[in-house]
Swiss-Prot record:
ATP binds at residues 1042-1050, 1065. Residues 1036-1292 form the Protein kinase domain. Coiled coil: none annotated. Residues 804-1326 are cytoplasmic. It catalyses: L-seryl-[protein] + ATP = O-phospho-L-seryl-[protein] + ADP + H(+); L-threonyl-[protein] + ATP = O-phospho-L-threonyl-[protein] + ADP + H(+). In the N-terminal section; belongs to the GDT family. In the C-terminal section; belongs to the protein kinase superfamily. TKL Ser/Thr protein kinase family. This is Probable serine/threonine-protein kinase gdt8. It comes from Dictyostelium discoideum (Social amoeba). Residues 1-22 form the signal peptide.
Amino acid sequence: MINKILIKLITIIIFCFSFLFAEEDLIRTPPGYYNLTRHKRYPHITEYQSSQDTDLYYPDVCRNALRNDIIPGVDEFFPFLFPGFNSDGPNSIYIQKNSSLLFKSESLGTTYNFVAVCVEGSFTVKGSMFFTINSLIILPGGRFESEAGIEFYDENDPLHIYNNPDFPKDPFGFFPGILVLGGTISVVAKESLVYRADRISNSSIEISPPFSPMNKINQTIRIFTELYPLGFYCSFSSDLERKILSLLDCLPISENDKIIRVLIEVDRDQNVSPTNILKKGKTTKGSIYITGDSNVYFKNMFFKNLGFTTNEPYNDTKLIFSPNDPNQVTDIIMGTNQRFRSSLYIEFSKNVTIDGCAFFEDNLTRSPLVLFDSNVIISNSLISSKSGSNIIAQYGTESIQSSNNSYILVKIDTASLDVDQNNNNNNNNNNNNNNNNNNNNNNNNNNNNNNNNNNNNNNNMDYGNQGNGIYSISPNINSNGDSFFGQQYAFNYYFISKNSVNSNQDNSSLLNSKPIELIIIDSSFNPTNSNGSLNKYLLNINSDGNKTISTYLVCNSIIEYYSGWLMDNLNSNQQISFEGNLFQNGCNKVDGNCTISQNSKYSTDLPKVANQTKFDEIVQLDKLFSNGITSINPNEKVIISTKINSKIHYYQIQLFFTHLPIDDQPTPLSIYIENQPVFLLEPIKSTFPTFNNFTFKFENKNSLDKINIAFTTRGDIYLTSMATYSSIVVEPPTETPTETPTETPTETPTDTPTQTPTQTPILTSKPITQISVDRNENLELKIALPICLSLALLIGIIIMICIFKKVQSNSKLKKDDDENEMATIKEGNKSIIVSQPPTVIEEKPQDNSKPDDQKLIERDQQINNPILKIREYPSLKDIELSNEETKSPQYGSLNSFSTLQFSRQYDYGSEEFPFQFNKQVLEFNLNGRKCMNDEVINDSLMIHNKSEITYLVNIIFPQNIETGCVSILNVEIFNESFELLPHCTTEVKFSLTLTCTTKFLENFAVLVEAQGSKCHTFLSVHVESETSLKLDYKEIKTEQLIASYLPSKVYVFKGYYRDLAVAVKKFAISDNSKSFEKIKNEVQILSKVNNINVVRYIGSAQNISHVCIVTEYAKEGSLGSLIHDSKIKLSFIQKVKFMLDAAKGFTFLHASEIVHGDIKPDNLLVFSKEISGVCVKICDFGNSEELGEKESKSKPDSTMNYLPNEVFDGEGYQKSADVYAFGVSLYEVMVEKIPFHEICYNDIPNRVQDGFRPTADLDTIDDDIRKIIECCWIKEKSKRPSFSEISLHLEIKFSKLLHQMNESEESTSNHNTNSKTKEDKDLDEN
């Protein structure tokens, strides 16, 4: 019995021992090679299962390394801690678990070179000298930190002092280099390496930020430009501020170089004093392989020519195992091009941060940075390489956050790659088949296997050699402010359906493509240095016919376009024909350039036109109108730049939109051309999906060959197509009192909604209509294509096919709408008697017959057809306010229609009324367009007396007394009545000007009097001005008072402008010129700033007593009211996101040389409490000022709680004061208490000057946030960070919090699933 128990105990001990050491097995190899250690790359990630060998094999250098003695109180490296340490020769050391050592390179009299340093505990390197090693292995749980440069030597290099010809070979080539197997590596240099620069002259540049002090160093830099993507060396001298560099002994800086980057490069062979190396930056030499859920942080490091993987087809090392012993390798087939030997190869690591680093490779490699199932945040870095890609993102890489990086690629020849690739793969397959005949257990290394069944490069995970910026298989990418130049594709996506074949994972979440999100904001792409082909893409997608779950894309393409194309299948050559016009798939044979701004996103499977079964002709329109674009963030401009013929003077642009309503509120749509608004906040309202067409004219006065068309919406209106027409001056059709339709409409849908009055017909005989369709249920998103939609001339023809059956009903509807809009007589206007010296035309009496109206019109020689004049974006003149009372006649107080009292009214066209007219509506020859502000427009009215009596005629024209937006220019001659003889005709001319954005839709009266009796009829004026920043005061409706500032008589209301909820800031006009100048300054600044984190300026308006500033409305209120007055408790991650958005906005303002002057939570508006998109925007620019040539502004009228010490000292308000105020606001948001509430308000200036800062609950704030706060409000203003630095730190903090939250939610979900499974099992058992 005892023997059986002992046997079981021994068996258990053996099992436990085997289990504990299963991850690290010793693999014996043939003579001449290192024995290998087998490492499970993802042993604890159960979702990854594979039938193939995915283990990692690295040289067994740690097993016999010298292990340190752990001596209490000794935490610094000394040789005596490692028994057997040889001070005269190479050593391999092992930092044991639970031990921590500090290596001070400069304090040691001897420079120690290590063959291997294995870290299972903690190892820190400090000092100014390089840390020289052959291999650094960070074991699971180990931690390595260094502020010194790391220099690698090759132990087999015959020139090296430690060369030993008996050193065995590393079959996989991990060393020299770094191997991280699940620990933490942090290599951070103190000084910046990469700088942005602007050209001053051929031999001088200005860099940003300024260089750090550089004393006694070899001042050599490498300059990268578009002409020289690999850079060139320069010596230099700098000014005292270290911003202006005078270049010596180098190539000139070309005027054509728009992108200039500067790198401080330090090499070992430079004559630099070791004590000064620290000041010039750190270099890292050696291939780096990171795996096993490691934590990675590199900052200000230089990775130079580390990559060994060439741009040739992969050829990996293969191990031939003994069929009788899984730990014995019988043969090694050495690979010639292993895929993981890039400068930096990272896999299965979700916490990777790279900041301010430089990657440089002038040899032809595959890529400097390769990611496999890893997430990375990379910022402020430079990647210049002669490679297939700057970055390759393989399976499972779910997130790349890239900001302010420069991706530079040298032109490469890819012509022979595909042929060589297939030949190589076929050879590899033959080798694999032969090997498999010998051993069924033949395995490849590191998930880098050539699959026998794969015979093309993509199926073998051999990709990214085409000349890409970022080549991606599955990640979500957020690119913000990056610069790409020289690539064939800036972003190249490849979706492969059978991931198990390629990733060797048979049961994995990677088997299905995940949702894709690509967001590109303010990034630029210049393909100047690529291979010269016209087929260059910012974004390219190759799906091989596979579908992803969903796709959320922002795209920007710079390739040439067809006039029209389909979007169903990019690889198809399908064409469809409408009336002989062809529409083709894709844009590979395009004719004419078109780009779409980077802040847009695609939506697929929009409601289909073909659902309208009564329109047999439009069945195929599904393929044209099933996709559309809109902005990522609400109310942000999406800009379409399209090519036109510079020799054609007049154009008509037609945009076709699909409205998918998200609620019952109207959606405002604004359209701009060349930065000039054409439609502003036009409300689109429907309860079901609707198509809307907008058409406008453009006069190409400057012979442009490309125009910018933009639109803004809250996100539920999609631009599905665009058509451009060249046009000529078209004379208006003959007008008659009674319009007779020329076409009979055919059957139309019964549910067609009322047409929007702003929609206009195209220049053809076929009309425009709206088509309403039912919204499709369960829309399944498809892969969005890489080409942003811009359908040109032929689209208009297709639209006409859709809509030609609605001509008469829409014409009547438009007319009825106009009449309804003008049916109300305005009161409170001054009476104007219109008098015009009559032009009497004698004609014979015609008893019982009507006058010939056609002849009346033919006599009118004043009708013209002015073409719309497009101006530049509204200048200061357009928004200029006046504090002088307007003296124009429209500011009267009498009733315009008071003289109509006791007069009999007749309907227009009544047979009993004695007069006839050539038109009922005065449109001032605009023909559907809008007039420009301040444009003088003219019209005339032919009046015919059809009676036998002479009449006295008065024309009573309405006036606008509220805002003065309507100015009657020839009012001085309308001061008395005139006579009109029987059967005579006269012409009355009208001239007026609209001085703001307004709709002048009014009735005017024609009053006739004879023999003591009076009668009148009404005609109409229908004029609308173009959109601008100067609004009509009467169209602004205030509803709810939000805030008031009584001393200055400033009030803030919630209101409405043309059915759009807005914030209205109303000022009372006073005699105080200073107060009025302040209002003008706020208007000027608002009109210039345009950023997603700054409240959107809609316009301003003025009447006799008040000025209004209108901005977008934040329904959540201010951040100050949210934290102090609301019962809602904000989470920590919400607060960080809100202040991150604010910091981004202030970064933009400071870059525009604008100081806000009044930063506090009350001036941060909350638009969304979600932690995605834009949550907070900056408002209230009453204290803002443009610095211009000045370095500071005078003390603002700001709250003392947020003013810094230097302002109280009288130094003026600078950018640093904004940073101080932001720090105080960040503190207030975190602790939710008014800053300085613990002291008397009047004591704040003195206490702040003495260095006192808010202390209440400061110690409860998160350490990272508290450091930001303390840096912001530090007394020395020169030490305060910039907002770009603040934004970066908040961005990193937010990303970490978001990652933790997602992990927590995933853990909770898994727990709930397991609990539910257990409950189900218990139920089954019961």
